[in-house]
């Protein structure tokens, strides 16, 4: 009998809503009785309104959730949470993009570092190649001379080989008609003749018993040198075989001459037995020829090739045997486990050998890396030293440029100094001397005319005194190096400095003007002495007379005027000379610095880069 609608709803309510187990569910008869009894309305109400605890919690939660969602604060909070989540997502995306950019920048930095390292390696290799090329060029230049010598020796040996291939024929030993002898025979004959002369010159003084050295010793040395030169020329120009044949020919010729002399003197014929060595003893001592040695070498090569072919055939046989044994082992190992064990053992042994090889290779690579690191450190240290040296060279070049500029300025000042002195002399001294010269000539003419009226008066001392051998001072100052002891003119200058009481190290630029002034004073005093002596002679030889006295007074007055004029001129000259002498020490210092240190532009009184010349020299 089928269940009614109420019964089905009650059964469904018990099963689904209350989750009653199948064993505890009521039977159909019980459900029918409950629905047909007075409690049917009650069960209908229960089915509609009674729910399980779980469903009640769900309903309550749903009600609370809907109330929670309807709250505007909750809506605002949810919107803010969504915004925060969105911002977090965007921030995460930005962080990811930044990480990607950082990775890309790191990759670019790594690539740039690798590129720079490759550039440095390339530059280093280029420098190494340049250094190696320079070394190769130097080695080539160093090998040019040995190569040239070897080429010359090779040409000489080729010429000697070509000459050795040519057979030299000598004529008969005894020939009545003169024949044209070969060049080698003439050279050997000349060498033997020089050797004979040398021995004769060497043995002749000993045979005479003389022990005192004489000019013959020089003759012996000369003959010895001639003989050595001829032998060297002979060995250089002719092969050894030709020389030996020429010597044998000369020996035979000399033997025939001795025989003829013995026969001519009526002596008995004596057999000149030559020590002929047996062929059996000499055959073993004869060196093999080059052809024989080459043949022996090729025979040895053929034997080795034959042995190689035999060894290759034996290797092929052993290889085939090994393959057969491997196939037999595979055939005998029918079990899969044993075969796997064998394969695993073989694989293990192969992997172990490969591991050992890789370990050895890793050790080699580690050692190579260590060596490369050491080499890199050395190269970095060398690079640092090269950079420091380059900086030092640049500083030195800058200093040299400054010194060259100062040097040119000093040269300009030095070139202007003598010109200024010469211009001063031309402006001051030359006009004064030209002005004094007519007056002196006029006075001399007056004295000569007056002397004609007094033939008995000796007026020679009154005439101007000319010193013989006195030469004007040179316009070019002597060098300061003339006081050096090795200079031929230094002895006279040093003696003059000792005589004048000046220090030994005094420069000749200061010594010569002082000596010239003292010499002029000496000449002036000698003139005065001669004048006084002449006056005394005139006074003692001639009778006193007014005319002579008046003449002498006139002469004295004129002489005084002349002396005054000359004194003024000499004072002016002395002032000019003093000024020139005051400038001489400065010129001396300039010239000394210029000649002793031509590459230095700094002078003693000048400062170059905060240093004086002695400080620069000390540095």
From Swiss-Prot:
Family indicated by similarity: Belongs to the HAUS5 family.
The protein's name: HAUS augmin-like complex subunit 5
Matches recorded under Pfam families: HAUS5
Entries under InterPro entries matching the protein: HAUS5 (IPR029131), HAUS5_metazoa (IPR026215)
GO biological process terms on file: cell division; centrosome cycle; spindle assembly
Localization per Swiss-Prot or TrEMBL: Cytoplasm, Cytoskeleton, Microtubule organizing center, Centrosome; Cytoplasm, Cytoskeleton, Spindle
N-acetylmethionine sites (modified residues): 1
Function noted in UniProt: Contributes to mitotic spindle assembly, maintenance of centrosome integrity and completion of cytokinesis as part of the HAUS augmin-like complex.
Taxonomic lineage: Eukaryota, Metazoa, Chordata, Craniata, Vertebrata
Main location (coarse class): cytoplasm
Coiled-coil ranges (or none): 73-108, 310-395, 550-590
Entry-linked PANTHER family: HAUS AUGMIN-LIKE COMPLEX SUBUNIT 5 (PTHR28588:SF1)
Organism in which the protein naturally occurs: Mus musculus
Oligomer status and interactors: Component of the HAUS augmin-like complex. The complex interacts with the gamma-tubulin ring complex and this interaction is required for spindle assembly. Interacts with EML3 (phosphorylated at 'Thr-882').
Domain of life, per lineage: Eukaryota
Keyword annotations: Acetylation, Cell cycle, Cell division, Coiled coil, Cytoplasm, Cytoskeleton, Microtubule, Mitosis
GO cellular component, as recorded: centrosome; cytoplasm; HAUS complex; mitotic spindle microtubule
